Amino acid sequence: MQRIAIPASANAPLTTTPVKIAIRNLEFYYGTFQALKQINLEIPEKRVTALIGPSGCGKSTLLRIFNRIYALYPKLEARGEVLLDGENILSPKYSINRLRSKVGMVFQKPVPFPMTIYENVAYGIRHHEVMSKSQMNDRVEQALQQSALWEEVKDKLNQNALGLSGGQQQRLCIARAIALTPSVLLLDEPTSALDPISTSRIEQLIEELKTKYTIVIVTHNMQQAARVSDYTGFMYLGDLIEHDRTETIFSQPSKQQTEDYITGRFG
């Protein structure tokens, strides 16, 4: 796939395809508080885009708009457009169930359900699809294979998932997210609660998964963003300050705020 030329200007739209998610004039409000301000961003298909910035800058808020998780809470409002494959997912006509099957999400802390390893992976499938037992077995195995967990758990699928290590639990959460065969995978600080060895394994997994999925990751770890992402967006106080190729952001940022943040002068 041809690499996408991304301009240094935060608000300049991408002009080269393929684009998986296109954000147009996006604003977000917690009641009367404006958390995101006129965000314009294009996220390329089957690449890793990292969102960085200090706590409270809006990066996790932006990530969670991509699957409309905010709809669970009152007095939260998104304005503008978020186009997934050309369709505005913020439209009331866009089904939440359809969106959740297309966009998987993994959170900061591993949250396996208190059930077997098998049932953790099968849980979402049962709510969205009807299939035979053999088809379900194949789908569960495929998800565990893709999350690099199959060889470790194939002989204990009926054991409680809470018995897995922290790193295994997070890979199980990834398996659960991709079991529905989404096209987008959202990762909200997926390694912040893990040890260095588990973190390294998750980072290797991200590199493997981007051949199949468009990945957006929120991270406070500058080194991690530099290692795993193809593109990086720097956010500050609800604004997207700069968005470019990761190597450019970390070596030749165009905005002083970006340079100050990645060099540790603030944040």
UniProtKB/Swiss-Prot annotation:
Membrane topology: Peripheral membrane protein
EC annotation from Swiss-Prot or TrEMBL: 7.3.2.1
GO molecular function: ATP binding; ATP hydrolysis activity; ATPase-coupled phosphate ion transmembrane transporter activity
Annotated positions binding ATP: 53-60
One GO CC term, this protein: plasma membrane
UniProt xrefs under Pfam families: ABC_tran (PF00005)
GO annotation terms (biological process): phosphate ion transmembrane transport
Catalysis performed (reactions): phosphate(out) + ATP + H2O = ADP + 2 phosphate(in) + H(+)
UniProt keyword annotations, A-Z: ATP-binding, Cell inner membrane, Cell membrane, Membrane, Nucleotide-binding, Phosphate transport, Translocase, Transport
Locations listed in the record: Cell inner membrane
InterPro entries the record matches: AAA+_ATPase, ABC_transporter-like_ATP-bd, ABC_transporter-like_CS, P-loop_NTPase, PstB-like
Span of domain ABC transporter: 21-262
Class of the enzyme per the UniProt entry, highest EC level: translocase
UniProt keyword Glycoprotein, yes or no: no
PANTHER family assigned to the protein according to its UniProt record, in alphabetical order: ABC TRANSPORTER I FAMILY MEMBER 17, PHOSPHATE IMPORT ATP-BINDING PROTEIN PSTB
Family: Belongs to the ABC transporter superfamily. Phosphate importer (TC 3.A.1.7) family.
Job description of the protein: Part of the ABC transporter complex PstSACB involved in phosphate import. Responsible for energy coupling to the transport system.
Subunit structure: The complex is composed of two ATP-binding proteins (PstB), two transmembrane proteins (PstC and PstA) and a solute-binding protein (PstS).
UniProt-recorded name of the protein: Phosphate import ATP-binding protein PstB
Gene this protein is translated from: pstB
